[in-house]
Amino acid sequence: HLLDTRRRRAAFADLDGDGDLDMLTTNKIDPEDNATSRMFYFENTGTKTHPVFHQRSHIPLFENYHYAPTLGDLDGDGDLDMLVGTWNKGIGFFRNQGTRSKPNFVLDENGWITLTRGSNSAPTLQDIDHDGDLDLFVGESSGELNFYRNVGTTKNPSFELVSDRFADIDVGRRSFPTFADINADGKYELFIGSETGKILMYREENSKEEVSFKHDPAFSLSLNNYATPSLVDINADGKLDVISGSISGGLIFYYGR
């Protein structure tokens, strides 16, 4: 099934509790309703090693454009909550009022996260300071990166802006960040998609006092324009795969070897 995602990211997680990865994906502007974007839930009806995605429903959100979802347990109750980036409204926080296998995402009106610069927010969650709670990184239209440290707890997150030009990162236009530990050393690699389709990689060089990343020029990967990468092991073969939206529509899968 080819979906007009155009520039938006897919998010992967086990959303029905059956042990394989399901998918949320969005479009830039919904062709059936030009007043908003739309988010779709695709269930993996295949297996962990041979995924087959079928569209089951769309997830109702607020009206805006350029939805960009990311998932994580933000309130410590064992199920997945959701942050959704937008064109011009910042980032919405959706608490899962359902369960791990039957999620019900409800907007927390007091949980909005606003940007100090840029638009087209593209959030991703990672415990980057290794303190047990999820921190927030946000790509945006200028091509730079916003870092919000979680100064709350695993049950009550509170995101405090550390820098809206984190590590002087600038990919040109339309930064889309995601994390992975590609060499299993306990440190994260930061991958950032861009408007040109080039994906840059930065390696974690944290100290006890500071979160820090350094660009690795040896890594090179170019996709279609407006790359929105996610790195997951989609077929459970122990190797990370890259899934990206693009300006031409649809999702592009690159399997790790």
Where are these regions (language model features)?
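Short glycine/acidic-enriched loop and turn motifs that connect beta-strands
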Residues: 28-32, 89-90, 143-144, 197-198, ...
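Blade-level signature of beta-propeller repeat domains, shared across WD40, Kelch, NHL, RCC1
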Residues: 227-257
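Hydrophobic beta-strand segments that make up the repeating blades of beta-propeller
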Residues: 23-27, 82-86, 136-140, 190-194, ...
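Beta-propeller blade termini
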Residues: 8-17, 26, 67-76, 121-130, ...
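Short loop/turn segments that connect beta-strands within the blades of beta-propeller domains
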Residues: 6, 35-37, 86-87, 140-141, ...
